[in-house]
C-alpha cells in the first residue's frame, strides 16, 4: 500500500477541493492530511472522498517547519507502506497516479527552473538557517522544491527524521527588522531541505527537472505546454502526474480546474 501525506492545517474545503477531487480521480489508496480543528464542512467532504486526517495541535503559521515532526511520528508508528509521497496541498492538482512513474532511486526530489544564487528568497532561507558557508557551497545548484518528495517508505522516514532534527539545529535567525516588527517568516524549511539534499547525506537519490520529470513546479517556469486533452506536459510530451504552484498560471488552468471541480 502507498501513502500520500500532506499538512493542510488552516485550509478550508474551497482551498483543498481541487487537490482532493483531482487526486481521487487517479488514485484510490491511502491519503492522510495533518489538520488542526477542521470545520464541519471540511470533515464531511473529506469523508465523502475517503480522505483520512489527523486532528492535531499543529499551528498553521508554523506548519511548514513543524509538519516533518508530524510526518515522522505517523510514519514511524505505521510501518505498513511501500512508497510515500510528501506533498503540498492548496496549490497542487493531479493528472495521473504519482506512483506509476518509473523512479529508479529510493528518494526523489524536484527542481525549479533557476539556481539558488538567483533567488533572493532561497538565499535568505539558507543563509539565515545553515549559514553563509553552506550557501556558498550550494548556491550554484538548482533550487530543489521541498513541496514534493517521493520515495520508498524507509527513505521518506529517514528524510523526515533529518528534516525535523535540522530544523531544530538550524532555527531561522530573523533580521533585526523582522524581529522588531514580529514578522512571521514562512517556508524556510526549504533552506534546510536544500542544505540536506546537496550535502551527500541521503543515499540512492535522484533529481528531476521540469523538462523530463513527473512533477511540474511552476513558480519560476517561463511557459506551459498542453496536449490535445488539455493536460500539462513536459518537454518530452509526457503528462505530469503532479502540477504544483498552478496558481502562478491560474488563467491557463481555468478550463482544467473547471473539469476537476465538476
Per-segment meaning from a language model:
Residues 70-121, 157:
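GT-A fold catalytic core of metal-dependent nucleotide-sugar glycosyltransferases
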Residues 138-253:
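Catalytic core and acceptor-binding pocket of nucleotide-sugar-dependent glycosyltransferases
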Residues 32-34, 83-88, 93-94, 108-110, ...:
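A structural signal for short, well-ordered beta-strand segments and their strand-loop junctions
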Residues 61-66, 117-123, 252-253:
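Short, charged, surface-exposed secondary-structure boundary motifs
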Residues 1, 129-131, 250-262:
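Membrane-proximal basic amphipathic "stem/tether" segments
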Residues 1-82, 154:
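N-terminal anchoring/stem segment of glycosyltransferases
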Amino acid at each position: 500500500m502507498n501513502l500520500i501525506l500532506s499538512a493542510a492545517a488552516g485550509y478550508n474545503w474551497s482551498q483543498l477541493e481541487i487537490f482532493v477531487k483531482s487526486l481521487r480521480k487517479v488514485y484510490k489508496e491511502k491519503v492522510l492530511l495533518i489538520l488542526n480543528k477542521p470545520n464541519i464542512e471540511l470533515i464531511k467532504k473529506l469523508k465523502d472522498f475517503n480522505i483520512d486526517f489527523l486532528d492535531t495541535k499543529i499551528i498553521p503559521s508554523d506548519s511548514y517547519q513543524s509538519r516533518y515532526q508530524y510526518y515522522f511520528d505517523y510514519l514511524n508508528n505505521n510501518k505498513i507502506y511501500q512508497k510515500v509521497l510528501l506533498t503540498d496541498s492548496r496549490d497542487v492538482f493531479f493528472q495521473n497516479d504519482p506512483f506509476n512513474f518509473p523512479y529508479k532511486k529510493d528518494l526523489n526530489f524536484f527542481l525549479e527552473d533557476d539556481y539558488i544564487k538567483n533567488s533572493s528568497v532561497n538565499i535568505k532561507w539558507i543563509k539565515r538557517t545553515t549559514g553563509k558557508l553552506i550557501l556558498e557551497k550550494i548556491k550554484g545548484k538548482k533550487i530543489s522544491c521541498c513541496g514534493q518528495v517521493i520515495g520508498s517508505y524507509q527513505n521518506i522516514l529517514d528524510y523526515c527524521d533529518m528534516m525535523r532534527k535540522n530544523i531544530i539545529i538550524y532555527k531561522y535567525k530573523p533580521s533585526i527588522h523582522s524581529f522588531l516588527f514580529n514578522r512571521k517568516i514562512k517556508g524556510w524549511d526549504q533552506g534546510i531541505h536544500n542544505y540536506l539534499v546537496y550535502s551527500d547525506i541521503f543515499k540512492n537519490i535522484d533529481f528531476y527537472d521540469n523538462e523530463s520529470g513527473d512533477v511540474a513546479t511552476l513558480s519560476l517556469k517561463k511557459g506551459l505546454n498542453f496536449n490535445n486533452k488539455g493536460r500539462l506536459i513536459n518537454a518530452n510530451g509526457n503528462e505530469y502526474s503532479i502540477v504544483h504552484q498552478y496558481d502562478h498560471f491560474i488563467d491557463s488552468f481555468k478550463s482544467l480546474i473547471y473539469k476537476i471541480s465538476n
